[in-house]
Design a protein with these regions (language model features):
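A compositional/biophysical signature of low hydrophobicity enriched in polar/charged and small residues
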Residues: 1-145
Length: 145
């Protein structure tokens, strides 16, 4: 678990640096990482992007109610919208939640009204604009410390 915790904090850390941090040999560590990848416990090594440098100034979640018979068609239509970055089926007052990244509030408004709002069989939406975000480390991976 310590290995996964450290990799979740920095997937780009070198094997020698990580082996020193964890107190195990680099060859053993390399074998463990390969095994975790093979078992698909580690799906991918990724990076964190500063979205603001790409012109993304507004992030929002949208709750969507839709006709259940048209779930697949609605998902396909949503995936064609560049600003939609994820789609999640949920329980509760919405059927679906999506994440939208936009340049600014005007752009977000345009995406919600002109693109998402025009998809057939979407009954209604509610937009939640992200004001501040704080990510927590994956502490469940760090139980042994």
């Amino acid at each position: 678990m310590k290995l996964l915790f450290e990799l979740s904090k920095d997937g780009n850390i070198s094997v020698p640096a990580l082996s020193k941090k964890l107190g195990i040999s680099a060859s053993v560590l390399y074998s463990r990482i390969k095994r975790l990848v093979k078992k698909k416990l580690i799906k991918k090594f990724t990076m964190e992007i500063d979205d603001s440098l790409l012109g993304i100034g507004v992030k929002a979640s949208l709750g969507i109610n839709r006709d259940p018979k048209f779930k697949i068609q609605i998902h396909k239509a949503l995936l064609e919208i560049t600003e939609v970055v994820s789609i999640v089926e949920v329980t509760g007052r919405f059927d679906t939640m999506i994440r939208v990244y936009a340049k600014d509030l005007e752009d977000l408004h345009s995406v919600v009204i002109e693109k998402i709002g025009k998809i057939e069989c979407i009954q209604n939406t509610e937009t939640f604009v992200e004001l501040q975000k704080t990510d927590k480390e994956l502490t469940y991976l760090n139980k042994n410390t």
